[in-house]
Amino acid sequence: MSNRFYDCITEFIFLDDKPQKADVIFVPGGNYPDSARRAAALFLEGYAPYVLPSGMYSKPVGHFTGDPAYRTEWEYLRDILLKEGVPEGAILREDQATFTWENAICSRHVLEKMNMQVKTAIIVCQAFHARRCYLYYKEQFPDTKLLICPVVTKGIARDNWFLDEEKIDVVLGEVERCGSQFHRIIKEKITNPGPCDHVVI
């Protein structure tokens, strides 16, 4: 059994749950196909009746950085889901979010408009992004059981992130953001126990 001093970082960042029956599968936005493909596989295996990809594009960039045939992350992810066999009626729409915090907020708004009660949800995200995704979505869905079913992207996994300088920078950058981006959210909870949609991070 490993006992490296940074194993606690691995356990903190790289969440990985076994999929269970859920009400919806969340797919935070991005310009890579892996998460949509994993979400489609989970859908086709019967784990949830809906998939909710979310995203417009990265706010600092101002446009979708993937295939120029698509205007938004949602369009891109939706197309992959369709190609993988997910029926159009099972794909929900959220195409306004520009970063992960907004993915969580806007996804909640979509489901509230549908009057959907979400007891259990699956989140398919990049493996190194798992903890921060969990924190954002848990803040917006406090009473929902969230299961993280990640995909390895950029070759960054729990068993190799510490072997390469670029991978180390990505993972430790996530650790830093899990602190820096939650100051205002957690402080807001002192007086406001509800969802903190209005907090700017």
Where do the language-model regions lie?
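A structural signal for short, hydrophobic/glycine-enriched beta-strand patches
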Residues: 1-163
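A conserved mid-domain beta-alpha-beta active-site/ligand-binding segment of alpha/beta enzyme cores
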Residues: 165-201
